[in-house]
């Protein structure tokens, strides 16, 4: 039994010495396809949850991290903008054609998107936004 305790301590120490803790957050590449998808999903959630008449659009991914849980958590720090397209007139699929005015409202958001690909399930578990500048 003592051997298992020593092994557990060694595993934790190796993880800490490598800068990683099992189940901890790991920096992710903002250009990664899965990170981009999580950021897009978070932006759609922001748009649907807001009281604005207009869609929100992803402008930039500033930072991203991942965490292995029962699936993967993607924590994304994103910048979004309020577009000129009304939610009642333009479906989300056509959002690419919607512009964000130069002097329009922009937001900085922190979101956690939980993905369980084998189910499949994607859920925003945290979304906090504030107006930029």
UniProtKB/Swiss-Prot annotation:
Record's subcellular location: Cytoplasmic granule
SMART domains to which the protein is assigned, alphabetical: CY
Cystine residue pairs: 85-98, 109-129
Expressing tissues: Expressed in hemocytes and slightly in heart.
Short motif (Secondary area of contact): ranges: 67-71
InterPro entries for the chain: Cystatin_dom, Cystatin_sf, Prot_inh_cystat_CS
Record GO cellular component, one term: vesicle
Keywords: Antibiotic, Antimicrobial, Disulfide bond, Protease inhibitor, Pyrrolidone carboxylic acid, Signal, Thiol protease inhibitor
MF (Gene Ontology): cysteine-type endopeptidase inhibitor activity
Site (Reactive site): 23
Pfam family, one: Cystatin
Domain of life, per lineage: Eukaryota
Record's function text: Tight-binding inhibitor for papain. It has an important role in the protection of cells, antimicrobial activity against Gram-negative bacteria, defense against invading microbes, and response to external stimuli.
Family to which the UniProt record says this protein belongs: Belongs to the cystatin family.
Name of the molecule in the record: L-cystatin
Species of the source: Tachypleus tridentatus (Japanese horseshoe crab)
């Amino acid at each position: 039994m003592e051997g298992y305790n020593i092994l557990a301590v060694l595993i934790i120490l190796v993880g800490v010495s490598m800068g990683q803790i099992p189940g901890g957050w790991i920096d992710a590449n903002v250009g990664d396809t899965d990170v981009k998808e999580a950021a897009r999903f978070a932006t759609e959630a922001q748009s649907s949850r807001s009281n604005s008449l207009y869609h929100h659009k992803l402008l930039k991914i500033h930072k991203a991290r991942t965490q292995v849980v029962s699936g993967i958590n993607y924590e994304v720090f994103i910048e979004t903008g309020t577009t000129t397209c009304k939610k009642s007139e333009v479906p989300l699929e056509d959002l690419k054609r919607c512009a964000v005015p130069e002097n329009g409202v922009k937001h900085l958001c922190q979101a956690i998107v939980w993905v369980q690909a084998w189910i499949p399930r994607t859920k925003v578990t945290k979304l906090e936004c504030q107006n930029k500048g």
